[in-house]
Amino acid sequence: MNLKFVGTHLRTLKLGIATLALAITTISAHAQQEEHSNPNVRLGQKALLDGDFRSAASHLEKALPAESKDPNVLYLLGYSQFHNGDYVKAASSFSKVIALDSKNANAYYYKAKANNNLAIAKESKLSLAQKGQLLTSSIDDYTKAIAVNVNDAKLYQNRAIAYRDLGILKGTSGAANYDKVAATDAYNKAIVDYEKVLTYDAARKDIQTEVKKAKVYRDNLK
């Protein structure tokens, strides 16, 4: 597979800069290897490079169970599912990647992000307790990713978001699960992580704003 071709098509995907960088890592690894022997994997890779995540997930699912022990195939499946908004399946796929490759920081990242998205989805029918469990799991996975890649600012930023969301969940006045102490602790930890991000780039106005907002949320707890 031509690396220039891969790079050109990757730039056409409608992804954020951070997620694009994560995708390049895995897809480039595939590109540098011989063409995969499984036709469904090849079709999945092509669909992914074309930005067709739904087709990519369909082809990669068909590659299982034959490729169920290949963390790269499972990663691409989870990545496709994530960008389809199928966060439950994505979290499951990334869990399988982690079981095969416990040092895969990107898998921890996407599993955490998928669970965070599930926890805060407006249409969610999950109980408050289930949402709290998802956010706690998300925080734990970001922490594991940080243990692998301690200097990745994105991991601290996203863990801060998970802490903030946990603070909102626990700190909503009148809610059955209201817990001022837990909410305060979550906001404080979010602030610490946001401030860690600023040590990498002190000029980031968005993070400065998030620090201020987290402090306001914390200080307004009743």
Predicted regions and their residues:
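Terminal, low-structured helical/coil segments at or just beyond the last alpha-helical repeat
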Residues: 3, 10, 32-37, 173-222
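Helix-start (N-cap) detector for alpha-helical repeat units in TPR-like alpha-solenoids
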Residues: 36-38, 71-72, 105-106, 153-154, ...
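Register position in tetratricopeptide repeats
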Residues: 49-50, 83-84, 117-124, 165-168, ...
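Canonical positions in the second alpha-helix
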Residues: 62-63, 96-97, 144-145, 197
